[in-house]
Amino acid sequence: PLFQQKAAPLGKKLWQTEHYVNSDANISTIMPIAKEIHDVMVTGSANAYVYWWIPHANGLTANDGTLFKRAYVIGQFAKHVRPGYFRVEATATPATNVYVSAYAGNGKVVIVAVNSSTAAVSQTFTLQNATVSQFSTWQTSASANMAAGSEASVSGNSFTFSLPAQSIT
C-alpha cells in the first residue's frame, strides 16, 4: 500500500477513520465492518481504526445510549487489542471468507477471527514464538453481542476452534 511506501519510512502513523457502511441490526450487513477493520489493520498496516460517530443513526449508539450491533463488531477489536499492543504475523485468510489478525502486548496474545461465511468453520490456529495454554473467547454473531464463549485449550502451540457463521471471535 501507498502508506508503506511513503509514510512508514518517515515514521508516520496511519489512522483509518470509518466511513458510511450500509449497516443495521442485521448481522449480514454488519460483517463488512469487521472485514474492513481487518483489511485496514492487516493489508493497510494502519496503527488505528477510529469510529467517531457515537450517538447517531450511523454511529455506535442511538441517542438514548442503546448500542447498535456495529458497536459490538468494533468492540471485538477495541476491547481486547489495547494501547501498546502490536499486530503480529498471522495467516490473514486461512480459509475462504475467514480473516484473521493477531496482536501481542502486556504478556498477552489476541487473535481476532472474522468468519463472514454463512456456515460455521472449524479453524486450526498454530502459534509461533509464544507459549499459551488457553484462550478466553468472546463472540459477536447474529444472536450474541460480545458474549463470553468457551475456553480454547492449546496443545503443542496449536488449537482448533469452531467459528460460527457470520461471526467475529
Predicted regions and their residues:
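Carbohydrate-binding surface patches
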Residues: 93-133, 166
